[in-house]
Structures are given as structure tokens and as C-alpha cells.
Amino acid sequence: MSLLVEIEKQLGNFHLDVRFQAETETLALLGASGCGKSMTLKCIAGIMTPDRGRIVLNGRVLFDSEVRIDQPPQQRRVGYLFQNYALFPTMTVEKNILCGIRSGSKAEKAAALSANLHRFRVGGLGKRYPPPLFRGQQQRG
């Protein structure tokens, strides 16, 4: 994976100014609380728009303020896992997953649900509600 990030973003009194390049499969952003790690990731994923700069992933320009390129999140092929898991607490794990499966027949949705329960290793938790789940289980649900 190749990633180039050179962005700036002003949000209230906070000024984000991030510049790095990585040529590795795994990348970790480390820093103190409130230093801009999540904001940087949101900009890479397209959830938040930088004020200026460039983001290039594997040779694809995702954002470039000078030439007005700003790929929408769904075209970036970047996943973002929110810190707050945004599960509906009154719905089972199965129903939470089904919210993300919008197309297909009833049988196709059931197959996709089963595959996702297995994929995220929460197969035995499908009928449970989110509040009693551990944070890692909520994240995978």
C-alpha cells in the first residue's frame, strides 16, 4: 500500500496540519488524545473534507484541493471503523447487520447475514442486544 497525506483542516480553535508518506501494508497513527488522529482518518476516508492539501492512495488521487478533486467516500475504497459503534441498542445484532444489507432476495439477505456473522466472529451473538456485549464484540457487530 502506498499512501501520501499532506492536508490541513481548521475546526474551531483546532488546526490540523498532517504530512506523511507510507509504503507499507500496516500503518498506525499514534498520538495524544485530541491531536487529530481521528480527523486525519476521516479525511482519508472522505467523511470529512480537508481545507487544503492532497491525499493519494495507491496512485489514486482521493483529494486534491488545487485541482478540485474530492472523491466521495464510497469511491475511495477505504474502510473506517467508528470509535462509537453506532449500533441500535433496541435491535439484535442480526437486525443491526441487516440494516447494512439493502439489496437482494430474502434468501440472499439471510445468506449475507450468516456470512457476516461468521466473518466477524459473532455467530453465537446474533439474537443478543448490543448493551451487554463487550466493546470488541460491539465493534464487530
Which residue stretches match the model-derived regions?
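Walker A (P-loop) phosphate-binding loop of ABC-type ATPase nucleotide-binding domains
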Residues: 32-36
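Helix-to-loop junction immediately C-terminal to a conserved catalytic motif
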Residues: 45
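Conserved coupling/switch loops of ABC nucleotide-binding domains, chiefly the family-specific signature
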Residues: 51-58
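Conserved ABC ATPase "signature" region
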Residues: 60-65, 107-126
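ABC ATPase NBD coupling module
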Residues: 62-79, 103-106, 110
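Conserved ABC ATPase signature
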Residues: 129-139
